[in-house]
């Protein structure tokens, strides 16, 4: 096992899959000569050349459409959006072409492509560059959506995403790229659609995904000091969703808190909370709590920026609420 950063784990996954399959190529803004906006693609241009590591203009709609066409023609593009905030410009290609092509063609066309890049709040990026747009993509039939929070999960799931014959949305985060964790030296993959219990507990299930995992684990440690044993369920894959792991955890703890850094209305977290409320009704000893960002545009002021997002304190308060403490 080696300890590497999240960005290094992504780079290893891309490098290994490009070496394994000559149909795999990378395209996006600054992925080549600049080594990626977040240095994920460091060294790949030198290794694979301009035919397989392609810098693009600042036109998400255009190069995402190029990736869709390349996938339909038999290649396996990895399309990097510098940020998912910019990806809104490419929604037509994602929603109306990539997601629907297999269905509309009666299975004659596959669209084996990955769209990856940072999603969600970062720091000092204000309203237009610090948004969690997860639900935009989980809402669309035909897309798979993955949101890993550790280097181990990121590498294993990205390799699986690249090998998948369907369009996969791969959600990362600016603040996660420097996170470190253990990653096996030997090759491995992680199946899409499997959650992971990051911490076992008996008193309350805290369900989350992506960047909030870190503060959820911190909250669980603080709760443990007060005698509250929280189980942490990391979804990792949002679509397909591992409902069985969620329900098994709630059946054990009888209480559930969902943490999602998106806005609360129609968020993926609110969908998970609804699923638990509906399917675990007889197991629940308290209503499900949702900890989300506030329903406001992201402020630029750092104190306000932190105030509108989920926090350790908010998660602990929600856990205590479902425990009637």
Locations of the language-model features?
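Thiamine diphosphate
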Residues: 1-167, 171, 306, ...
């Amino acid at each position: 096992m080696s300890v590497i950063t999240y960005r290094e784990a992504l780079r290893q996954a891309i490098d290994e899959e490009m070496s394994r399959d000559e149909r795999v190529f990378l395209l996006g803004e600054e992925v080549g000569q600049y080594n990626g906006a977040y240095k994920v693609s460091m060294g790949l241009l030198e290794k694979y050349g301009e035919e397989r590591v392609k810098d693009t203009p600042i036109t998400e709609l255009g190069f995402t459409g190029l990736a869709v066409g390349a996938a339909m023609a038999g290649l396996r593009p990895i399309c990097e959006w510098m940020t998912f905030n910019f990806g809104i410009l490419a929604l037509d290609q994602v929603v109306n072409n990539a997601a629907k092509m297999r269905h509309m063609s009666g299975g004659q066309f596959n669209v084996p492509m990955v769209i990856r890049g940072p999603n969600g709040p970062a720091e000092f990026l204000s309203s237009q560059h610090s948004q969690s747009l997860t639900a935009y993509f989980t809402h669309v039939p035909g897309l798979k959506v993955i949101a890993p929070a550790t280097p181990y999960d990121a590498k294993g799931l990205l390799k699986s995403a690249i090998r998948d014959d369907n369009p996969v949305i791969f959600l990362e985060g600016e603040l996660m790229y420097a996170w470190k964790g253990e990653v096996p030296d030997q090759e491995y993959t992680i199946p899409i659609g499997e959650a992971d219990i990051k911490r076992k507990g008996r008193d309350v299930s805290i369900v989350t995904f992506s960047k909030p995992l870190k503060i959820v684990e911190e909250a669980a440690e603080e709760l443990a000091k007060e005698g509250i044993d929280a189980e942490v369920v990391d979804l990792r894959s949002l679509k397909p969703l591992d409902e069985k792991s969620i329900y098994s955890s709630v059946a054990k703890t009888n209480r559930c808190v969902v943490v999602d850094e998106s806005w609360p209305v129609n968020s993926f977290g609110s969908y998970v909370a609804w699923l638990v409320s509906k399917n675990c009704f007889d197991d629940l000893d308290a209503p499900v709590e949702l900890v989300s960002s506030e329903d406001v545009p992201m402020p630029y002021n750092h104190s306000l920026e932190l105030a509108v997002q989920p926090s350790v304190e908010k998660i602990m308060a929600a856990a205590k609420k479902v425990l009637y403490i």
